[in-house]
From Swiss-Prot:
SUPFAM superfamilies per UniProt: Metalloproteases ('zincins'), catalytic domain, RmlC-like cupins
A cellular component term, taken from the record's GO annotations: cytoplasm
Record carries keyword Hydrolase: yes
GO molecular function, one term: metalloendopeptidase activity
Biological processes, Gene Ontology terms: rRNA processing
The name this protein goes by in its record: Endoribonuclease YbeY
Annotated region (Endoribonuclease YbeY), positions in chain: 123-294
HAMAP family in UniProt: Endoribonucl_YbeY
Cofactor: binding comment: Binds 1 zinc ion.
Alphabetical keyword list: Cytoplasm, Endonuclease, Hydrolase, Metal-binding, Nuclease, Ribosome biogenesis, rRNA processing, Zinc
Length: 294
């Protein structure tokens, strides 16, 4: 068809194949009108299932002719489906997204007037896709099921606040007997405690799926006891344990003053109030003042 002249005075020339790394093949034909009309471009496109183009607000009118399959066009938030044999028109200046929501490939033609040029398409930069976080919980306490959903909700919220994505977090809600056994086995401390953290090892690069952070184990018995002792609600007490344990999984600790202040600030960010490390720092400060008065 290259160089062929039609009776209407439009010359079409065959364009080169334009490779795309999103799996969409474009064979482009550009026609320039020899009369007083604006130049136009004609492109044949094959869009695979699941394909989507970034939003754009073009300075040209575009006519879409679907040959096979189905094309979804979202114009100013309104979705239209163009099936085989149908034609769609997108006026210039409208925000539009093209995508293929069907099961098979969509073969269609696009006619733009004036001719398509990237600088006239005003294509938006797509936002990076945020990978979903996965939170699982095991309940090994007779009364723990009432709090399982609450802990899971908090955990997801904490991960978002910490700007983490594509990670997996495991939670366990146990009694004092179980957490004492874990504390004795892994920390050589034969007593119950409030929360334990077990970081996951590093996976080989390229391993598919979410990145595991590790396990946070919370004692519901200790939470009940300490909530009553310090005048806090049980929910508040467990939220403190969860925030504390999660930060330990991420490598934070409170051994040195500078690290403790950093961890205390992060706990307060997650909880909206003072956390376990801040309380510990306050106790230490009071002890130092008491010793100085002796």
């Amino acid at each position: 068809m290259s160089g062929a002249r039609r009776g209407n005075g439009v010359r079409l020339r065959k364009g080169k194949l334009i490779p795309r790394d999103d799996g969409k093949r474009i064979e482009e034909f550009v026609g320039a009108a020899t009369t007083s009309t604006d130049s136009a471009s004609v492109a044949r496109m094959l869009a695979p299932p699941g394909w989507s183009e970034p939003a754009q607000r073009p300075e040209f009118d575009e006519v879409v002719i679907v040959l096979t399959g189905e094309l979804t066009i979202v114009v100013e938030g309104r979705r239209e489906r163009i099936s085989a044999g149908e034609v769609g028109l997108v006026p210039r200046g409208k925000r539009v997204v093209y995508r293929n929501d069907g099961q098979g490939a969509c073969d269609y033609w696009s006619v733009c007037a004036p001719a398509f040029r990237p600088e006239l398409a005003h294509m938006e930069t797509p936002k990076p896709r945020v990978q979903e976080n996965h939170v699982t919980i095991q309940v090994a306490h007779g009364q723990g099921r009432d709090f399982a959903r609450l802990l899971t909700t908090w955990a997801r919220a904490y991960l978002v606040q910490l700007e983490l994505s594509g990670v997996e977090l495991s939670l366990s809600l146990v009694d004092d007997r179980a957490i004492r056994r874990l504390n004795r086995t892994w920390r050589k401390k034969d007593k119950a405690t409030d929360v334990l953290s077990f970081p996951a090892g590093d996976l080989p690069k390229g391993t598919p799926g979410p990145r595991p952070l590790g396990d946070v184990v919370i004692s519901l018995d200790t939470a009940k006891r300490q909530a009553k002792e310090y005048g806090r609600t049980l929910e508040s007490e467990m939220a403190r344990y969860l925030a504390h344990g999660l930060l330990h999984l991420l490598g934070h600790d409170h051994e040195r003053p500078r690290d403790a202040k950093r961890m205390a600030a992060l706990e307060e960010q997650l909880l909206g109030e003072r956390g376990m490390v801040a309380d510990s720092l306050q106790v230490d400060a009071k002890a130092r003042r008491a010793r100085s008065l002796m």
